[in-house]
Amino acid sequence: MKNVIGLILAGGQGTRLGVLTEKIPKPAVQFGGKYRIIDFTLSNCVNSGIYRIGVLTQYRPHLLNKHIGIGKPWDLDRKGGGVTILQPYSTLTESVWYKGTADAVYQNIEFVDEYNPEYIVVLSGDHIYSMDYSEFVYYHISKGALATIACMEVPITEAHRFGIMVTDIENKIIEFQEKPKNPKSNLASLGIYVFTWNFIKEVLIEDSKDNSSDHDFGKNIIPKILSTGKVYAYPFEGYWQDVGTIQSYWETNLELVRPIPPFNLHDPNWRFYTRSEEMNPAYISENGNVRNSIISEGCEIYGSVENSVISQGVFIDEGAIVKNSVIMTKVEVGKNVIIEDAIIAENTIIKDGCKIGVGHFAESKYDKKVYNSPITVVGMDSIVEENCKIGKNVVIGNDKIVSANTVIDSGGYLI
């Protein structure tokens, strides 16, 4: 698709993921054993024939920049295109972060103009889904649209979390509400757009001069351009998940180990690519026991794993039991450890005899808005010393050391 540029918005923190995004942005969070969340959007681009891509980063971008690099795992290390990391930059008059999603694109008009595209696809880098963007663009063209928004129906009880649209029989959008208290429909924007470039460029320039604007596509740009009569909805019927909360992130990972998972990581016609460290094959010992789980490269399993996603380079020692959990890269689990209903972030060490995620649910004493499920979360680069007992809905921060024999009751925290 030589007349199309892809712009991936990847600067968000993802505050509802708590400690998982304190050190890295949401698009860089691990998913599915070997991937990072942004891998799915990047892979969708190349599978759709879009090879000119800008990734707009902002919050703690170092790991994301390193992960993407020159784009080799996605076949984006090429002349006349490829992937470019686009961070906010200083001018003679100001030095600011992107003020909103629309401002992020506005600040990179020069980058887009270098390729002189007819259309741009604006994408979120923090969702789990597969979509053929070429079909999306062709739909936009067939409608004679100036803007097209990918959408899907959501439960009406969840509609207040999304941009909600009302359409006519031809899918023309006649009304748009950004996160309404009383939604008029359950047709939700996925934050995925196709724009005719010459049109949206002028709209963004005009919006940049409006001091009352939040410079956001959902809040400002889409409502403003509805009057053109050329803004359409693109109904998407495939799999899409936001994974924006602890609960949804955990659930979406564990959906992958169902007998027939709703999201297929193994489709030979739509592969997902990533940058990952070369490791030896996984090893399961004579006494190791694995049931209904993903075990990634470099793992050594001497204990038991059930209904879990185990990322690369994880070591699980003898007598350990891991159930219903997401274990990220290079975690070490000691002898006779029990981990249940938990997320253990990268490079963390759980020493012998610990019990994590045990007991009964209790409300969080730290942050009820973020930590409101039975899931216990242990941040990256932490150490839980021997024989600790940690309940459900507990959060342990990044870079923490939990002293031996510590008891943290359900709903507790160490930040």
Curated annotation (Swiss-Prot):
Catalytic activity: alpha-D-glucose 1-phosphate + ATP + H(+) = ADP-alpha-D-glucose + diphosphate
Gene Ontology annotations of biological process type: glycogen biosynthetic process
GO function terms (MF aspect): ATP binding; glucose-1-phosphate adenylyltransferase activity
Entry annotated with the keyword Hydrolase: no
SUPFAM superfamilies registered for this protein in UniProt: Nucleotide-diphospho-sugar transferases, Trimeric LpxA-like enzymes
Family, per entry: Belongs to the bacterial/plant glucose-1-phosphate adenylyltransferase family.
UniProt cross-references to HAMAP family, sorted A to Z: GlgC (MF_00624)
Protein name according to UniProt: Glucose-1-phosphate adenylyltransferase
Naturally occurring in which organism (per UniProt): Fervidobacterium nodosum (strain ATCC 35602 / DSM 5306 / Rt17-B1)
Upper lineage: Bacteria, Thermotogati, Thermotogota, Thermotogae, Thermotogales
